[in-house]
Amino acid sequence: MACQICDDTGWKAVETNGVRRVVRCDCKREEHARRLFEDARIPPRYRNCNFDNFQVYPNEKLTNAAAKVRKFAERFPDVQRGFCLIGPHGVGKTHLAVATLRAALARGNQGLFYEVSDLLRVIRNTYNPVTKTAEMDVLQPLLTAQLLVLDDVGKEKTSEWVEETMTFIVNSRYNQRLVTIFTSNYEDTPDIDVLDSLRVRVGSRMYSRMHEMCDFIEYGGADYRLLPPNGGVDDLMALWKVAGEQKSKLPTRAKNQLRAQMKPAKELGWSGGKHGT
């Protein structure tokens, strides 16, 4: 059925202070927004994530994080830096990142979402001789999107290829002044003795670039994935308490062993990235 306003021409006449002019019809704006949303690769599980359905509770760091991210979303694209959400599993990092992306898409900005492990799998598939997709077919949208969300950074097992590929993407966006959002479960510390730190997981070059590009926002809290159906604030507070108790009981022996194993590499000058960098 044709649009009753523009008859599917995409344009409509408006009059302001006696002056008639032609502007884009709302139907075309809606169609454009739908197309942007479909091309953004947001996984079905997260497609309905927004700021209004992000459930907060008396957790100062979490509420501050949500407020900062929402302010960023309201200002985009008039921003200079992205952000990196750091925290344990299930505290809503992906929800907040997608809520920001959806807000940008709704205002006509081009955006893209990739879980890093999935992105690397897609790129690897282009090396298969029977695959018709070229590597740059995958990379080009990442290098040009107005807003890119890279979810779960550091999850992929570290290798020279992984580090080179991710550093190329991040560095290219940095040079083009394009905004990137990251999420990660790994601790933000410059200490290369901590093997499960973000710096060691992604390599020193990418870690340094991320800090140049982004504001780091770190918080903890309840695991939303454990929230029962129709659970509320009291349930979240209880889950948060349990999470805090479990964290306080974690043994330090394993961590000390890892530090001891890392010491020889540190003495040889390994920075956490490739050998010799």
Language-model-detected regions and their locations in the chain:
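P-loop NTPase Walker A phosphate-binding motif
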Residues: 95-109
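A short, basic N-terminal segment
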Residues: 1-64, 227-277
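Walker A/P-loop nucleotide-binding motif
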Residues: 79-97
